[in-house]
UniProtKB/Swiss-Prot annotation:
Coiled coil: none annotated. It comes from the Bacteria. The lineage of its organism: Bacteria, Pseudomonadati, Pseudomonadota, Alphaproteobacteria, Hyphomicrobiales. This is Dual-specificity RNA methyltransferase RlmN. CDD domains: Radical_SAM (cd01335). It catalyses: adenosine(2503) in 23S rRNA + 2 reduced [2Fe-2S]-[ferredoxin] + 2 S-adenosyl-L-methionine = 2-methyladenosine(2503) in 23S rRNA + 5'-deoxyadenosine + L-methionine + 2 oxidized [2Fe-2S]-[ferredoxin] + S-adenosyl-L-homocysteine; adenosine(37) in tRNA + 2 reduced [2Fe-2S]-[ferredoxin] + 2 S-adenosyl-L-methionine = 2-methyladenosine(37) in tRNA + 5'-deoxyadenosine + L-methionine + 2 oxidized [2Fe-2S]-[ferredoxin] + S-adenosyl-L-homocysteine. InterPro entries: Aldolase_TIM (IPR013785), Methyltransferase_A (IPR040072), RlmN_N (IPR048641), RNA_MTrfase_RlmN (IPR027492), rRNA_lsu_MTrfase_RlmN/Cfr (IPR004383), rSAM (IPR007197). [4Fe-4S] cluster binds at C158, C162, C165. Binds 1 [4Fe-4S] cluster. The cluster is coordinated with 3 cysteines and an exchangeable S-adenosyl-L-methionine. NCBIfam families: rRNA_mod_RlmN. Keywords: 4Fe-4S, Cytoplasm, Disulfide bond, Iron, Iron-sulfur, Metal-binding, Methyltransferase, rRNA processing, S-adenosyl-L-methionine, Transferase, tRNA processing. Residues 144-394 form the Radical SAM core domain. Specifically methylates position 2 of adenine 2503 in 23S rRNA and position 2 of adenine 37 in tRNAs. m2A2503 modification seems to play a crucial role in the proofreading step occurring at the peptidyl transferase center and thus would serve to optimize ribosomal fidelity. HAMAP family: RNA_methyltr_RlmN.
Length: 431
């Protein structure tokens, strides 16, 4: 099976007119720029080698020097070039003059009663579409006894307008680059003390089994990953590199609302686990909950799942099903779900609906959720009920929305026009 390419070259994209994709400016890997110098954190090997070539490192040395920097950035978590003890002073000076090891800015950190952490991250500005301020995204760390899961974002905002999802109320600003996606993992390891020789901050909830604090990645944050598939594939490649960040691809899950044409690309080039935001068993209801269903209806979606590269009993597809009171939680819908998934190696994650300001839905009663789970389980499918985590800090499934989008309407309009941007950002609402 092919592995993810770490080169910066891309196959030619075919022009399309998908009505669900809002065209946005491309963001190059050098997007993380601070004080006029691009950061090297989060780059692919190919991009890192290009940066060395750009400052005059001889071609015969580039492979070796790339390996050195790769190790310091992705294994040791170096925050300065000075820390790189096996890199010569001359090269250090060149690197310091041209580049940084900056991470995205941590604007805020919220810690839930259950130990979940949510970070609001600000990326350096990449152009006028970022309003000369830098886009903001959220990522979430969810600790458990046997794992630590980081939920990462792939876009700033989202185009899909799923009616039960808070992120769907935030318009799409742009795709995140592969570098910006990977940098979320680097920031999490910084904040958790998850690099060699470090210890977590006092009071931090982390796995107790001796594993890495961040052991799993889920692309379940802001955005539709498969509308940014090139950068997601590259980010998975960097995250799973055995000589770097070192996460197992079987511990990296990409969740999609059903962008069917990109399933094969994801399965072959990223070899990641697949999760489907299903949430309904009838097209008329899914059209309302997940409007993308009008383009790729349930039958088309499930056929693509049956053909997903590498799917097997050992690599099951996860189907996510949010439990909405009186909407999709009946016994008959549980039985229809079982019928639809027949022949697909699968497990079903039942997700109690997480409320957010302005939502018109309610969470199913606990007894109803248990009954739904029982029907699915008795039919032979694992049907765990996802424990809500981080609800008190709006960090749970479907609750993410970057703080920029919580600006008062007038302030946001001023920002979009480039008027008084610095002053406007003091007007962020706390809700």
């Amino acid at each position: 099976m092919a592995t993810a390419s770490l080169d910066t070259a891309r196959p030619e994209r075919r022009a399309g007119s998908d009505p669900f994709i809002e065209k946005t400016p491309e963001v190059r890997p050098e997007a993380m720029v601070a004080t006029g110098r691009p950061s090297l954190v989060g780059l692919t090997r190919g991009a890192l080698r290009e940066r060395l070539a750009a400052i005059g490192v001889p071609e015969r040395e580039q492979r070796m020097r790339t390996g050195q920097l790769w190790h310091w950035i992705n294994v040791r978590g170096a925050a300065s070039f000075e820390a790189m003890t096996n890199v010569g002073k001359g090269l250090k000076a060149q690197l310091e003059e041209a580049y940084t090891l900056d991470r995205p800015e941590v604007v805020s950190e919220q810690v839930s009663r259950d130990g979940t952490r949510k970070w609001l991250l600000r990326m350096p500005p990449t152009g006028r579409h970022d309003h000369n301020r830098g886009a903001e995204i959220e990522c979430v760390y969810i600790p458990a006894n046997d794992r630590g899961t980081l939920c990462v974002s792939s876009q700033v905002g989202c185009t899909l307008t799923c009616s039960f999802c808070h992120t769907g109320t935030q318009r799409l600003v742009r795709n995140l680059s592969a570098q910006e996606i990977t940098a979320q993992l680097v920031v999490a390891r910084d904040r958790l003390g998850d690099w060699p020789g470090q210890v977590p901050p006092k009071g931090t909830f982390v796995p107790v089994d001796g594993s890495r604090f961040v052991s799993n990645i889920v692309f379940m944050g802001m955005g539709e990953p498969l509308y940014n598939v090139d950068n997601v594939v590259d980010a998975v490649g960097v995250m799973s590199d055995n000589e770097g960040l070192g996460l197992s691809r079987r511990r990296i899950t990409v969740s999609t609302s059903g962008v069917v044409p990109q399933f094969e690309r994801l399965g072959i080039d990223a070899n990641a686990m697949l999760a489907i935001s299903l949430h309904a068993v009838r097209d008329d209801l899914r059209d309302e909950l997940v409007p993308l269903n009008r383009k790729y209806p349930i039958r088309t979606l499930l056929e693509a799942c049956r053909n997903y590269p590498g799917v097997s009993n050992a690599r099951r597809i996860t189907f996510e099903y949010v439990m909405l009171k009186g909407v999709n939680d009946s016994d008959s819908e549980a039985r229809e779900l079982v019928r639809l998934l027949k022949g697909i190696p699968a497990k079903i994650n039942l997700i109690p609906f997480n409320p957010w300001p302005g939502s018109r839905y309610e969470c199913s009663d606990w007894e109803r959720i248990e009954r739904f789970s029982e029907i699915v389980f008795n039919a032979g499918y694992a049907s765990p009920v996802r424990t809500p985590r981080g609800r008190d800090i709006l960090a749970a499934c479907g609750q993410l929305k970057s703080e920029t989008e919580k600006l008062r309407a007038r302030a946001r309009l001023m920002l979009e026009d480039g008027i008084g941007a610095e002053g406007v950002y003091g007007a962020v609402d706390d809700d």
